[in-house]
UniProtKB/Swiss-Prot annotation:
GO molecular function, one term: structural constituent of ribosome
Family under the similarity heading: Belongs to the eukaryotic ribosomal protein eL34 family.
Top-rank lineage group of the source organism: Archaea
The protein's name: Large ribosomal subunit protein eL34
One Gene Ontology term, aspect cellular component: ribosome
HAMAP family in alphabetical order: Ribosomal_eL34
Segments of this protein annotated with the region Disordered: 1-22
Length: 89
């Protein structure tokens, strides 16, 4: 019976072979899902995957790209947004 802390959905089972040809179960934390664009849903490059605890340890410049809407919108959507805003200005 696994310990209660391993029954969570955030734990992932990894099967390993131990000496004597017995298989044992290790539990690992699941990775965070990849960041996606808020407008089109495309995967964002330059945004790290990881739990909040791991990401807070990173430097500010490693957390998201250094451009407008970095970490929220993909470059194509940012370009479209800039054109729309410039035309309506």
């Amino acid at each position: 019976m696994p310990a209660p802390r391993y029954k969570s959905g955030s734990s992932k089972k990894v099967y390993r072979k131990a000496p004597g040809n017995s298989s044992i179960v290790h539990y690992r934390r699941k990775k965070q899902s990849k960041a996606v664009c808020g407008a089109c849903g495309a995967l964002l490059n330059g945004v790290p995957r990881g739990r909040a605890v791991e990401i807070t340890k990173l430097a500010k410049t490693q957390k998201r790209p250094e451009r407008a809407f970095g970490g929220n919108l993909c470059p194509k959507c940012v370009k479209k947004m800039m054109v729309i805003k410039a035309r309506n200005f």
